[in-house]
């Protein structure tokens, strides 16, 4: 991970005066989150092209030196932002599955209900644009997709149905993320209900010759 949890000059001074290590770690974590939020704000407001170290430093209201204690380069910052994005998708999976306990595949059912909101989609689009300068930054995202489709291949609903659900969700997500026009909100909502019914086993795909 690119992030370095080093203590800033101010934190080092506190340590010299007998401050406990946990408080230093907490302060470093708070500073890290402050930087990441500043970077998110810059991207959300101006797009990936405006994501520069100077812009983030100014937005965070700190010195360049303090920033560099946590992120040495723009690549380090981007990698951490992407890792956090992946963690946001993965985090709380067990909790998201709770409403679907008893379904054939609670994991698959939860994927439909966990579609990211507009803010996360815009952030993802901006980050994808940013990593165009360094494709290796997409490795955490590739790893996440790999896990998703490994789960789908083992779904109790079957690979075909799980694959249809995931491919549809990916299509909706990527289209909206890139700002491509698709369905009206009402039609999209109906589509999501259909996908959810398919995931939960309330709707089945029956070949014509077996109807």
Sequence positions of predicted segments:
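Solvent-exposed, amphipathic alpha-helical segments
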Residues: 38-46, 92, 168-175
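Generic hydrophobic, amphipathic alpha-helix propensity
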Residues: 28-42, 56, 81, 85, ...
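Short alpha-helical scaffolding segments that buttress acidic/His motifs in well-ordered protein cores
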Residues: 111-112, 124-131, 165-169
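N-terminal intrinsically disordered/low-complexity leader segments
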Residues: 1-30, 205-211
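Helix-turn-helix
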Residues: 34, 42-76
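Hydrophobic/aromatic-rich alpha-helical bundle segments in the mid-to-C-terminal region
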Residues: 135-142, 146-211
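Hydrophobic alpha-helical connector segments
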Residues: 87-125, 192
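Residues at secondary-structure transition points
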Residues: 22-30, 46, 72, 76, ...
């Amino acid at each position: 991970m690119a992030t370095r949890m080093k203590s800033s000059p101010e934190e080092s001074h506190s340590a010299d005066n007998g401050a406990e290590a946990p408080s230093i770690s907490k302060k470093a974590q708070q500073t890290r989150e402050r930087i990441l939020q500043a970077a998110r704000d810059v991207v959300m407001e101006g797009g990936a092209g405006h994501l520069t170290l100077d812009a983030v430093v100014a937005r965070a209201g700190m010195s360049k030196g303090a920033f560099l204690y946590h992120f040495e380069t723009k690549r380090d910052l981007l990698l951490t932002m992407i890792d956090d994005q992946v963690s946001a998708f993965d985090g709380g999976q067990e909790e998201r599955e709770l409403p679907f306990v008893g379904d054939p595949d609670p994991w698959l059912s939860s994927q439909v209900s966990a579609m990211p909101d507009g803010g996360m989609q815009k952030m993802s689009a901006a980050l994808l644009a940013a990593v165009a300068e360094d494709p290796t930054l997409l490795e955490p995202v590739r790893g996440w997709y790999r896990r998703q489709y490994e789960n789908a291949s083992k779904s109790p609903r079957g690979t075909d149905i799980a694959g249809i659900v995931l491919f549809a969700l990916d299509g909706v997500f990527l289209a909206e993320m890139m700002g491509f026009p698709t369905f009206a909100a009402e039609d999209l909502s109906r589509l999501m209900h259909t996908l959810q019914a398919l995931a939960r086993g309330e709707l089945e795909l029956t070949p014509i010759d077996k109807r």
